[in-house]
């Protein structure tokens, strides 16, 4: 959790990042103690349905401060709890049975600085873009017996002084999304994936099986353009890393591969 608090501190000027509640309603506020920020320009946080836990803490904090625009799935995963892992082998003395596994015990729940939990609800994106998980139940809310959503008192924080013109940003973004054929194709693919997951048809004759397999292959080809989409995003390593590339070819290869993956976002 400390890592995500430090990360948020790069973009906000001192203040609470997340609240943690334990048994007995004890509340602890995790704060960025450092004055000043490393970057004060426009900021976007990309999320999807699998963004969970620490990534939700970061997205929620920057959203509450009005510091960033959250873009991605309708909501993130919705994991707002903290677990401790207790190895059973450390508890039972003279154990001759080998590894006994471990217990994972939920001990805490974390909350946004505005007071609401990310449990179940996750973080709602400001700008929603479909992806392959859009019509698949993958969140905490879709699990058996999840802890409920609740809220506590808001922490004392000061919103970002350079407030974003959300109305203008959302309007222009929506217009671009509606005109983007790739977004429409992505939504179509997401619906198709969901339909295939729900289809439990079992073909008992070889001819029907082969025909269905060929149909699926042809249908999937219609979405190949998505893998070739050029985001036109450019990435470069920080100067101190670039100076290391001449001596560390492995580091350079890792960064090149990472930048290539980032460009697909």
Where are these regions (language model features)?
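Conserved acidic, small-residue-rich alpha-beta core segments centered on
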Residues: 1-152
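Conserved functional hotspot residues or short segments at active or partner-binding sites
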Residues: 112-265
């Amino acid at each position: 959790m400390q890592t995500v608090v430090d990360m948020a501190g790069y973009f906000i000027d001192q203040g609470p990042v997340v609240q943690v509640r334990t048994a007995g309603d004890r509340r602890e506020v995790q704060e960025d103690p450092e004055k000043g920020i490393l970057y004060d320009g426009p900021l976007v946080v990309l999320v999807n349905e699998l963004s969970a836990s620490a990534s939700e803490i970061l997205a929620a904090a920057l959203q509450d401060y009005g510091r960033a625009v959250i873009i991605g799935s309708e909501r993130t995963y919705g994991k707002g709890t903290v677990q401790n892992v207790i190895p059973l082998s450390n508890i039972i003395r003279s154990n001759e049975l080998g590894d006994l596994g471990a217990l994972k015990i939920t001990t805490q729940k974390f909350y946004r600085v505005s007071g609401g939990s990310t449990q179940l609800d996750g973080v709602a994106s400001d700008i929603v873009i479909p992806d392959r998980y859009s019509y698949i139940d993958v969140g905490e809310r879709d699990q058996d017996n999840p802890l409920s959503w609740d809220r506590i008192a808001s922490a004392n924080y000061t919103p970002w002084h350079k407030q974003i013109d959300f109305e203008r940003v959302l309007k222009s973004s929506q217009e671009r999304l509606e005109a983007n054929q790739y977004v429409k194709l992505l939504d179509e693919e997401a619906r198709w994936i969901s339909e295939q997951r729900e289809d439990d048809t079992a073909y008992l004759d070889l001819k029907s099986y082969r025909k269905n397999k060929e149909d699926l292959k042809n249908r999937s080809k219609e979405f190949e353009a998505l893998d070739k989409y050029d985001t036109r995003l450019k990435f470069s390593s920080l100067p101190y890393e670039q100076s290391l590339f001449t001596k560390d070819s492995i580091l350079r290869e890792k960064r090149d591969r990472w930048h290539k993956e980032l460009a697909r976002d």
